[in-house]
Design a protein with these regions (language model features):
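Class I SAM-dependent methyltransferase SAM-binding "motif I" and its flanking Rossmann-like core
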Residues: 85-153
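Class I S-adenosyl-L-methionine
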Residues: 1-104, 115
Length: 243
């Protein structure tokens, strides 16, 4: 049966890819992905047939994978982070209903919530949720409801897609929503370019986060009531009693 791997490539550097992901890419004849992600693979896979599509051509990218697989080639579709977390794994299964004799296999990767948390310290050490601020596929009113529910439930929150060229004020809007239920001195932080050249992080308060300059390669963390700043790192208490 024809084979397609749906590969989570992690945040960027090869060192942060799982061995399973590298093995899948090495076993593939064709690697398909968003232009930026293919460039991140570097020289290691240049002997493969590399096919790219620009942003917002996700459906075309998925169909391309199936067409190549039906030519008898083993295909990998690469997604940043984990393919099943804001990636293309679900879309591949949906589109796959149109094609026969193609086996799909999802290869997990390190998502930005995990890799970004490691840079910041230990902000996800208790219950947490992830929320994307992109309204391309989810209406803003639903995003707002999720922000409110997360704040009221005292979850640590990892925000994906906090800004873009067309959504420059979305993080500010999200902070304004959270500030209705959370005090402005709540410990927060954000990481830019996780696992790539120029990785940097900032620890701040929710009030300060409101005016932070972020982009689409930034992941934002809002702490819960038990989150504190220790030696410049963002740490959420698990609940152990320390004497």
């Amino acid at each position: 049966m024809n084979k397609i791997y749906i590969v989570g490539m992690g945040p960027g550097f090869e060192s942060m890819m799982t061995k399973q992901a590298i093995d899948a890419l090495e076993a593939s004849d064709v690697i398909v992905g968003y232009t930026v992600y293919i460039k991140l693979l570097g020289e290691k896979f240049q002997t493969k047939e590399l096919l790219t599509t620009p942003m917002r051509q996700e459906k075309e990218r998925c169909h391309l994978c199936f067409k190549k697989a039906l030519e008898g080639k083993t295909v990998s579709l690469v997604c940043s982070g984990d393919a099943g977390i804001y990636g293309l794994a679900s879309l591949m299964y949906e589109i796959g209903q149109e094609y026969d004799n193609v086996e799909l296999s999802v290869i997990p990767g390190i998502t930005a919530a995990n890799s970004g948390a490691a840079v910041l310290g230990a902000p996800l050490n208790h219950d947490f949720c992830t929320i994307s601020l992109s309204d391309l596929l989810t209406p803003w009113d639903k995003i707002e409801k999720r922000l409110v529910a997360a704040a009221e439930g005292d979850f640590v929150i990892a925000l994906y897609n906090p800004s873009s060229h067309k959504r420059k004020d979305y993080l500010m809007r999200a902070c304004d929503i959270l500030l209705r239920a959370i005090e402005p001195d709540r410990a927060c932080g954000y990481v830019k370019n996780i696992g790539r050249e120029g990785t940097s992080y900032t620890v701040c308060t929710l009030g300060e986060l409101r005016s932070a300059q972020v982009n689409m390669f930034t992941t934002v963390f809002i702490g819960n009531e038990g989150t504190q700043i220790i030696d410049g790192k963002l740490v959420t208490r698990r609940g152990y009693q320390i004497e």
